[in-house]
Amino acid sequence: MKAFIFELCVETLPAAQAAELGGADRIELCDRLDIGGVTPGEKLISATIQALSIPVHVLIRPRGGDFAYSAAEFEQIRLQVHRIKQLGAAGVALGVLLTDGRVDEVRSRELVELAHPMKVTFHRAFDRTPDLSEALEAVIRAGADCLLTSGGEPNVLSGAKQLKRMVIQAGDRIPIMAGGGLRLASMAEVLEQTGLHCLHGSLTRRAVDGPPESGHGRTAAEILVADVRTAVGLMQGHFAAKMI
């Protein structure tokens, strides 16, 4: 079994293809990352699944804003889970909270069961909960396969101490995946401080080296491939050093 997982969050097919070319273990496919992400369209989901050989996980979020959903919104989520499973996705990322901010275990468990055999990541709705320790137990009880979190902080580096506590609390019951403000410059520090084996990021940045037609610049896709390779290389180096 591989020592680590690097998941890239993308919202276009070229970015998804760049993720695979760069060595990402899987992608999370989203739309509207500018508002925190919502469920992408079926055409993009289908095209991405067909184009990639690595696992495609799909964000399920019907709207921006909070994660306490009405009955109609929850039914929409259920339908999206069912349809994405039909399309052949390997997994979904979702999160449902109660109006008081706690994890909605009943609805979450229902979605996990509906999604099977797809893998289910409980996403960063988790970071909105008032008690992260109890929320972790709720996510485990709901049957999720992975938890994506920044440790309740704006970014994974500032949440590193909490992430380490969560890794210890979770043990081998659920993988903790750090995501939120992940930067190449801080990846090694995050891994060292937390004991994590799974990282999630978008690694987005502007292609500033010049336009592709100049012959001196790189396209956004080429930059992303290079960044993913750097991220994967950093993780490989970290875990190789741990084995010495």
Mark where each language-model region is.
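Hydrophobic faces of well-ordered beta-strands that scaffold small-molecule active sites
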Residues: F4-V10, I27-L29, V56-I60, V92-L94, ...
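Glycine-rich phosphate-binding active-site loops on the catalytic face of alpha/beta enzymes
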Residues: R26-V38, R83-T99, A144-G159, R183, ...
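Hydrophobic, well-structured mid-protein blocks that either form specific transmembrane helices
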Residues: K85-A142
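Catalytic cores of alpha/beta
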Residues: E11-L21, A68-V81, D127-A142, L163-A178, ...
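Active-site beta->alpha loop and helix N-cap motifs at the rims of alpha/beta catalytic domains
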Residues: L13-A15, A24-R26, V38-T39, I45-E105
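Alpha-helix-loop-beta-strand connector modules within alpha/beta enzyme cores
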Residues: G37-G64, V103-A125, S158-L184, T219-M243
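N-terminal amphipathic alpha-helix/helix-capping segment at the start of soluble metabolic enzymes
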Residues: M1-C9, L13, I49-Q50, F239, ...
